[in-house]
Amino acid sequence: MKNIFFSVFFLLSFLLCLANVSEAAVPCSTVDMKAAACVGFATGKDSKPSSACCTGLQQLAQTVKSVDDKKAICRCLKASSKSLGIKDQFLSKIPAACNIKVGFPVSTATNCETIH
């Protein structure tokens, strides 16, 4: 009986931890919405990031509460960049142009799992 209690307790604790982790991560829909105005510059169609791009990314940066959030944002951006034709030579310039510190290299080649 004692073993069953501890097994159930462990399982519930584990599930609660998973729920907290998944709630903490920034959803891709939010990332896509906030970064949408940056696509023109990131694909080379616009000569500089728009003010809407910078505002969206600043708002996105304010949602970051943890390393898991940074990793989630990185994964979302990488996934979107493949389908949108994002070019690294433009993408990497966005943080400086928008005066945003992201804490990791902005590139389609970034290994999101190494972000800390």
From Swiss-Prot:
Disulfide linkage: 28-76, 38-53, 54-98, 74-112
Keywords: Disulfide bond, Lipid-binding, Signal, Transport
Signal peptide: 1-24
Annotated PROSITE patterns: PLANT_LTP
Molecular function GO labels: lipid binding
Gene3D superfamilies noted in UniProt: Plant lipid-transfer and hydrophobic proteins
Coiled coil: none
SUPFAM superfamilies (UniProt xref): Bifunctional inhibitor/lipid-transfer protein/seed storage 2S albumin (SSF47699)
InterPro entries: Bifun_inhib/LTP/seed_sf, Bifunc_inhib/LTP/seed_store, Plant_nsLTP
One Pfam family cited in the UniProt record for this chain: Tryp_alpha_amyl
Top-rank taxon: Eukaryota
Gene Ontology BP, a term: lipid transport
Family: Belongs to the plant LTP family.
Primary role: Plant non-specific lipid-transfer proteins transfer phospholipids as well as galactolipids across membranes. May play a role in wax or cutin deposition in the cell walls of expanding epidermal cells and certain secretory tissues.
UniProt-recorded name of the protein: Non-specific lipid-transfer protein D, cotyledon-specific isoform
